[in-house]
Amino acid sequence: MPHMVALAVGRDPLLLETRGRVLRNAGYTVVSALSVEQALQSFVSRDFEIVILCHSLPRRDRERLTYAIHAHSPNTPVIVVTARVSAMDSFADAMIENEPEILLQEIPRILHQAPEKYQREPKRA
């Protein structure tokens, strides 16, 4: 797998640190953000292959952040990690269970499910 950079966003510092450690141990570079504003600042300052939103963010914040990311970079997938997958956040590209093994299995699948959608293109200015 080529080197991947992920943006992980959530309000719970412990969950965010744990998720970041899991991703780093799997070879990802991880930038973490504790708020929508911090996430947007990070997102516009560098390229990310994927954005991972934690269920600890309120739904309206997940939605707002997803739309902002897709407006800036339509081909960057946004996934929501949740305690239980029952209802899809219709704005997200995927929702997955909050299990490290599932997260690590699903990221490559999401990136390869529609390669033409997620191929890197320059971010909009």
Enumerate the language-model features and the residues they cover.
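Non-catalytic signal-transmission and effector/linker regions of two-component phosphorelay proteins
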Residues: 1-13, 85, 100-125
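Conserved acidic segment of CheY-like receiver
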Residues: 3-14, 19-23, 51, 79
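Conserved dinucleotide-binding and phosphotransfer motif residues
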Residues: 25-26, 72
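Residue-level detector of anion-binding/catalytic polar loops
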Residues: 29
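Alpha4 helix (beta4-alpha4-beta5 surface) of REC/receiver domains from two-component response regulators
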Residues: 59, 64, 76-105
